[in-house]
Regions:
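Acidic/polar, glycine-enriched structural segments that form the non-catalytic walls/loops
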Residues: 1-135
Length: 135
């Protein structure tokens, strides 16, 4: 779309032969070159890493949509814009709050590990499968 944004989709041919997941990605540095490999279906990007560039670390904000590329972009724009370290800290706090809702007593450390791992797996993908605009 522009020199910091890429949109597209991934076409899965496994469990659902026509399943597409659309995405929008915005990068912190400018994309100066790109190449799409038709054989592997991969996009290769080269970023501006000059001294004038914002940062040596390139951050990406990514959103997905089951509807279309515009839906992915709307989803991206509707979310709070955090730096990576901010998002990591916020999500660590959210996970800690969620996982601490249940506590077990009288279990061995191994049993606790199994329990909390299973609980984590139950909570890892509570997805709302619609775009921010309700589609």
């Amino acid at each position: 779309m522009n020199d910091t944004t890429v949109v597209g989709y991934r076409h899965s041919k496994s469990w659902n032969p026509n399943h597409k997941v659309y995405f929008a990605a915005v990068f912190s540095n400018k994309i100066i070159r790109h190449r799409f490999d038709d054989t592997t279906k991969r996009l290769f990007l080269a970023f501006d890493n000059t001294l004038e560039a914002k940062t040596a670390v390139i951050e990406a904000r990514v959103a997905i949509s089951s509807t279309d590329e515009n839906g992915a972009m709307k989803n991206l724009l509707s979310q709070e814009c955090l730096r990576f370290d901010q998002a990591k800290e916020k999500n660590l706090q959210l996970w800690e709050a969620e996982l601490s809702k249940l506590q077990i007593q009288g279990a061995t450390d191994k049993q606790k590990e199994i329990f909390y791992t299973a609980y984590y797996h139950c909570m890892i993908a509570p997805n709302l499968y619609s775009d921010t605009d309700g589609r």
